[in-house]
Regions:
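Conserved beta-strand-loop-alpha-helix hinge of the TIR/SEFIR fold
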Residues: 1-2
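Acidic, PIN/NYN-like endoribonuclease modules and their adjacent C-terminal/linker elements
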Residues: 5
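Long, low-complexity, intrinsically disordered terminal regions
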Residues: 9-211
């Protein structure tokens, strides 16, 4: 034949995995990315719906109880790798939001998104943790998303949004006193004992785990 159909590419491992974690954001993502690209009037609403679905279902990435560091580190690394497709999906939508000058009308939705996922970094009473390593994978995910958020805003010269972020007071609905009911973007930067302890036991140590 004149034109030979190319062979199918390799299916990503995360799709074939039997126990893969899914956030159920596919439909909301496609709708949001389409509305943003087409300049639809309800594009901001579609973005808000996607961010809400994402933050609500991110809870599925929380790790189960574990009392052994090596086992916890293995689960930690697996969850980080499994999250990559969803991080990339989230980033792609954010890039399109910035390119289409929609960051101003979706800024509050993004702030509520970060408030929601920040709750997953808090210690759960019903879970037994490895010493000082509670919710480290969620802290890593949150920190990475915040860094990416700032980077994309800067790359697209959304300087007003960056300034607003740095001046925003986030609301902690679990706060008990006037001192912990609000917090700033600095709360999204975490020291991860999981990677620190693993680095201490490794033959080749990294100078900076956050760089």
């Amino acid at each position: 034949p004149l034109f030979v159909k190319p062979k199918l590419g390799r299916v990503p491992d995360y799709i074939l995995a039997d126990d893969k974690i899914t956030l159920g954001t596919t439909a909301a993502y496609r709708r949001a990315i389409s509305f943003v690209a087409e300049g639809r009037a309800n594009a901001a609403g579609a973005v808000r719906e996607y961010l809400h679905t994402f933050s609500e279902n991110l809870q599925s990435f929380q790790l189960p109880s574990c009392d052994n560091h090596s086992d916890y580190y293995e689960h930690f690394m697996t969850s980080i790798k499994d999250f990559v497709p969803y991080r990339d999906e989230w980033l792609e939508l954010l890039k399109n939001v910035c390119r289409n000058d929609l960051i101003e009308v979706t800024f509050d939705s993004h702030m509520r998104f970060f408030e929601s996922i920040h709750l997953y970094t808090k210690e759960r009473r019903e879970v037994t943790y490895v010493y000082q390593e509670e919710e480290d994978n969620m802290k890593f995910i949150e920190y990475e998303l915040m860094l990416c958020f700032i980077a994309i805003l800067l790359k697209n010269e959304c300087f007003v949004a960056v300034a607003d972020l740095f001046n925003t007071s986030f609301y902690n609905k679990l706060g008990n006193t006037e001192y912990d009911v609000t917090y700033t973007y600095r709360e999204f930067e975490h020291f991860l004992y999981t990677t620190y302890n693993q680095n201490q036991n490794a033959s080749q140590r990294y100078y900076s785990l956050q760089a």
